[in-house]
Curated annotation (Swiss-Prot):
Family, per entry: Belongs to the PsbI family.
Entry protein name: Photosystem II reaction center protein I
A Pfam family hit: PsbI
UniProt membrane topology term: Single-pass membrane protein
Location of the protein in the cell: Cellular thylakoid membrane
GO terms classed as biological process: photosynthesis
UniProt xrefs under InterPro entries: PSII_PsbI, PSII_PsbI_sf
Coarse class of the protein's main subcellular location: membrane
Length: 38
């Protein structure tokens, strides 16, 4: 049960990070200060 919970947390964190990174990369005009971040 603990392994399943850890796996779920890893998948959720991975999708959240992927969504945030993709959102920032595809919309640099909303965050002009983060252009040098990519």
């Amino acid at each position: 049960m603990l392994t399943l919970k850890i796996a779920v947390y890893i998948v959720v964190a991975f999708f959240i990070a992927l969504f945030v990174f993709g959102f920032l990369s595809s919309d640099p005009t909303r965050n002009p200060g983060r252009k040098d971040f990519e």
